[in-house]
């Protein structure tokens, strides 16, 4: 069963997908969306979910450094409920503290330009979220 990993931001959603064995995560794309309309990314996600035969979703849960859930975390929880209801697949939330910073560091070390980093940072964060989940399984 393949798993989709999502890094949900206010304007974009980074998307990653696991291999069939659940060992590795690969970046798929970054979807632009409007977080005030939870269904604005449904069409693109539907294509990915059916093309890759996804059976589960992992959504990054941004927590504050003290472990509490803030506004962004609540937004991720709302989106997780939406995904579960619309696509009828189980969703787990995964602590994503510092994944975007780690993704930024990896891209900086790869000597990627700022404009290129901006295009792939969310997809890279989704890969790190999903890979973290796969590694602990």
Swiss-Prot record:
SMART domains: YqgFc. One of its GO terms (molecular function) is nuclease activity. GO terms for biological process: rRNA 5'-end processing. It comes from the Bacteria. Keywords: Cytoplasm, Hydrolase, Nuclease, Ribosome biogenesis. HAMAP family: Nuclease_YqgF (MF_00651). This is Putative pre-16S rRNA nuclease. It comes from Oceanobacillus iheyensis (strain DSM 14371 / CIP 107618 / JCM 11309 / KCTC 3954 / HTE831).
